[in-house]
Structure formats: C-alpha cells, structure tokens
Amino acid sequence: GLNTMNAALVAMNAANALRERSVDALHMRYYANVVDNGGGAPNNVPMRTVVDVGLRALTVKKLEEMSRDVDRAYIAGAYSQGVRLEIQTTIGYCPRRESRPLQLVFLDVAKRLFPKEEISDTENTSAGVSDIGDISSLIPTVHAFIGDGGPSNHTVKFHIIDKYRMGVTAAKEQVGVLLELLGDNAAKAKEIMEEYKPTFARREDYLAFEEKYTKTLKAVDYDADGKVLFKGE
C-alpha cells in the first residue's frame, strides 16, 4: 500500500539537505517531528502521517524563502510515494532585529549602574525568537539582559540570587533609558525612530504578512485517473 511514513521520511531528508544551500546555516533553523499516526505497529502501512515542522531565520525574506523550499521538499516526498499532502501553515514570531543606536543608549546607562567588567556589548544576532521580533519589525527595539550570575534561564535550576540587582537596579536601568530617550523634547527617541528601517513600513503590511502565511493548502492531490495535481507555490 501507499506508505505515508516513507513519504514523510523522504520529505524530511530533502528538507534537511536544504541546510547546505544556506549561507547562514548557523542561524537557520529547521526542525521536524512526527507527531501523529505514522503507523500503529511495525507491520502496519500507515495511511496518514502528521509532521510538525518549525522554521527560524534571521530575516523575514530568508524565512519566506525557507518556507517555500521546505514546502517543495514535502511536495517532493509526497509525490515520490504517490500520497496526498496537505500543508497547514501558521505564522510564528518574526526574526528579532535590534536597533544599534538604542543598544548604545542602554549601554551608556548600564555603565552608570554596573561595574565595567560585568557589561558585555555584542552586536551578534540571535536566532532566538519571541514576540519582541514582531515588535522590532515595526519599531526600534533592544533586547538586553540583566543577570545576577545565577543559573541560566530556561533551566530547572533557574532562580534569582540577587533580588536587589534583578529588581531595583534593573528598574533603574529601564527608567534611565527612558530619561535618555525622552529628554530634550524626546530628541534621541526621534533620532532613533527616523534612522530605523523597519521590516514592514506599515502595520497593514505586517498584518498582510501574517495573513499570507496562515493557510491550509492541498499541495499534492490526484484526479480520478491518478494524475498528480500540484498546488504548491
């Protein structure tokens, strides 16, 4: 019979091979897991397999390219085994972009509050994502961290060691940044806003992007004669 798990394996291998085409493979993220069906027993031929796929990239343009290429990989996998394919796409977070001028304001304030040896200035972009990425696609942002030397966040052992530093001093940092931005009739804030080139010029453009990548597509189907019908981009 038609084995959808085999089709999924072909598709996942094809998508994995896309990493070799990326000029920024260290920040490209593709991950996939079979989350449903795929065979109830070793000797069963699975008629339905569900794969959950996630993508990350440093820019929206790269993310769109990856989405297109990964769709093609799964279309190829389905076609190779003669099975149908439905692709359900939902948008996650936009890649995070940071405003260098806003970073410098944060650093200037930090130098008044923290010892020099405890301040790290890096412009390296992280592939980590959160809703700050969506905000940064429209307005200047900074995603700074204030730590107290305790266990790393996102770990079981994470806890606060220095409550004053993490509460009061961190609050002083944020207020200090606001004072710098809003002083002199918000001159610095206006300068940063004018220099920033957002991913989306308008909120409407951002919403259109979100809508474009929220869809369900019957990417591979067959007519009554068994002729394949491709509906992917």
Kindly label every feature range from the protein language model.
Residues 1-104, 108-110, 124-133:
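Midchain, well-structured core segments that form catalytic/ion-binding scaffolds
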Residues 20-24, 81-85, 116-118, 181-190:
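Surface-exposed helix-capping loop/turn segments at secondary-structure junctions
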